[in-house]
Swiss-Prot record:
Reaction(s) catalysed by this chain's protein: N-(5-phospho-beta-D-ribosyl)anthranilate + diphosphate = 5-phospho-alpha-D-ribose 1-diphosphate + anthranilate
Matches recorded under Gene3D superfamilies: Nucleoside phosphorylase/phosphoribosyltransferase catalytic domain (3.40.1030.10), Transferase, Pyrimidine Nucleoside Phosphorylase, Chain C (1.20.970.10)
Record-listed anthranilate 1 binding positions: G81, N112
The protein, known as: Anthranilate phosphoribosyltransferase
Species assigned in the record: Methylobacterium nodulans (strain LMG 21967 / CNCM I-2342 / ORS 2060)
């Protein structure tokens, strides 16, 4: 495509695109007007140089313009990760989302099938009985009645099908690995956002601020997890009241025992679904601890807990009282209605 060639030529020299140039270039990519060779060369040129913040904002703008939107109540948040950490861990953010919603914070969760593990959010939720691919009206009902919905990325970002074959052929991470988490169809302004590399935390937090988010914790575990981990400390870059601050979370300071990395490894969707149900039914496992800790952080991001200690207590109570299990049961029922 001739109109795409100037953008390809510019990134091939190592120069960065402006925000508007990036938006136009990605609009071409998402429209299916670009050949696989052009798309692959463009994405790898960005990857080798490293994507600039304005390029990410522009690309996200192009994807957001094409996405199928969902109406969400005020104060709704997302708990999401980039994936790609190659940990094979349990579905931590999914269980944390259920617990958070049971505490009264609406969670408009956005996700997909597995990226680097054997079970992504969509995979485990399907194994739990949640119906995927709902339309915006049905998702709004899930939020209203269960306090939680799952927006299947394939349904809301159909334009990404044009680059899917290229991403498979490249076989490596590209900017599209982080675009999905930046483009929540419900337009939430609060996120607990896990990244696969510590170097991404501050740039992506600033990108989310540019895109309209007001409260964000971007996290990266010392073990490489794109979650708040319980095997050691987690680095946090937080956006609060228009300012960026950095701090570290140590699970031991919150009364949680350190886990071994193998304690957090999941398996296939059915195995992970059974482990998730066991936690909601009262099992005291490392999976419970890491999910409670991440839910606690989500409660702080949402303004529903003053600090992590209060958040841990609220999240644990939601599990122990059966409220979290009831939230999952409602989500299954409403999504299948």
């Amino acid at each position: 495509m001739d109109s795409f060639k100037p953008y390809l030529a510019k990134v091939a020299t190592g120069a960065a695109l402006t925000r508007e140039e990036a938006r136009t270039a990605f609009d071409h990519l998402l429209s299916g007007e670009v050949t696989h060779a052009q798309a692959g060369a463009f994405l790898m040129a960005l990857r080798v140089r490293g994507e600039a913040a304005d390029e990410i904002v522009g690309a996200a703008g192009a994807l957001r313009e094409r996405m199928v939107r969902v109406a969400a109540p005020p104060g709704a948040i997302d708990i999401v990760g980039t994936g790609g950490d190659h940990s094979g861990s349990y579905n931590v953010s999914t269980l944390a989302a259920i617990i958070t919603a049971s505490c009264g914070v609406p969670v408009a969760k956005h996700g997909n099938r597995a990226a680097s593990s054997r079970s992504g959010a969509a995979d485990v939720l399907a194994a739990l009985g949640v119906r995927l691919g709902l339309d915006p009206e049905a998702l709004a009902q899930c939020l209203a009645q269960a306090g939680l919905c799952f927006m299947f990325a394939q349904t809301h970002h159909a334009s990404m099908r044009h680059v899917a074959p290229v991403r498979v052929e490249l076989g490596t991470r590209t900017l599209f690995n982080v675009l999905g988490p930046l483009c929540n169809p419900a337009g939430v302004s609060g996120q607990l956002f896990g990244v696969y590399a510590a170097s991404l935390a501050e740039p992506l937090t600033r990108v989310l601020a540019d895109l309209g988010s007001t409260r964000v914790w971007t996290v990266h575990g010392s073990d490489g997890l794109d979650e708040i981990t319980t095997t050691g400390p987690t680095a946090v870059v937080a956006l609060e009241d228009g300012a960026i601050r950095r701090f570290t979370i140590d699970p031991r300071e919150l009364g949680l025992a350190l886990a071994a990395p193998e304690d957090l490894r999941g398996a296939d969707p059915e195995h992970n679904a059974a482990a998730l149900r066991a936690v909601l039914d009262g099992a005291r496992t490392p999976y419970r601890d890491i999910a409670v800790l991440n839910a606690a952080a989500a409660l702080v991001v949402a303004g529903a807990a003053a600090n992590l200690g209060e958040g841990v207590a609220r999240a644990a109570q939601a599990v122990d009282s059966g409220a979290a299990r009831a939230t999952l049961d409602r989500l299954v029922a409403v999504s299948n209605a």
